Amino acid sequence: MYRTMMKSKIHRAVVTEANLNYVGSITIDEAILNQVDILPNEKVQIVNNNNGARLETYVIAGERNSGTICLNGAAARLVQPGDTVIIIAYALLSQEELQSFHPKVAIMDESNRVKQMIEQEPPMTVL
């Protein structure tokens, strides 16, 4: 049996741009993607902390070290620049893979720089 598990998480990133006229997707700073092991074109879920909206799209790598978090296309209707979001990627893992698996979680600062990397979230934690 395979289980769908959180593989990667970018926690509390700040939206820098919402571009309605782009074809679609989310553009994320390439340096952030590398740290949490998310690839271009990988499917992600985005949770908007400001309004509760949840959506799925795919990733485009943005300029390295730019801090870019840009929602494109229809997704731009669900966010505003300055909103805080959580970006999550999932993986299908076998029981065997689960034994040694650790997700990568990046805790972001207000400038979209990785403040801290953790392998799992402590229970009942406010970050």
Curated annotation (Swiss-Prot):
Signal sequence segment: none
A GO term, aspect molecular function: aspartate 1-decarboxylase activity
Cofactor detail note: Binds 1 pyruvoyl group covalently per subunit.
Subcellular localization: Cytoplasm
Cellular component terms per the entry's GO annotation: cytosol
Cytoplasm keyword on record: yes
PTM note: Is synthesized initially as an inactive proenzyme, which is activated by self-cleavage at a specific serine bond to produce a beta-subunit with a hydroxyl group at its C-terminus and an alpha-subunit with a pyruvoyl group at its N-terminus.
Positions of the catalytic residues: S25, Y58
Pathway recorded for this protein: Cofactor biosynthesis; (R)-pantothenate biosynthesis; beta-alanine from L-aspartate: step 1/1
Record's keyword terms, sorted: Autocatalytic cleavage, Cytoplasm, Decarboxylase, Lyase, Pantothenate biosynthesis, Pyruvate, Schiff base, Zymogen
Matches recorded under Gene3D superfamilies: 2.40.40.20
Cofactor or coenzyme needed: pyruvate
Residue sites binding substrate per the record: T57, G73, A74, A75
InterPro entries, per the entry: Asp_de-COase-like_dom_sf, Asp_decarbox
Membrane-crossing segments per the record: none
GO biological process, any: alanine biosynthetic process
Keyword Lyase annotated: yes
EC number(s) reported in the record: 4.1.1.11
Short name of one Pfam family: Asp_decarbox
NCBIfam families, per database record: panD (TIGR00223)
Biological role: Catalyzes the pyruvoyl-dependent decarboxylation of aspartate to produce beta-alanine.
Assembly and interaction partners: Heterooctamer of four alpha and four beta subunits.
PANTHER family reported in the protein's UniProt record: ASPARTATE 1-DECARBOXYLASE (PTHR21012:SF0)
Name of the protein in its database record: Aspartate 1-decarboxylase
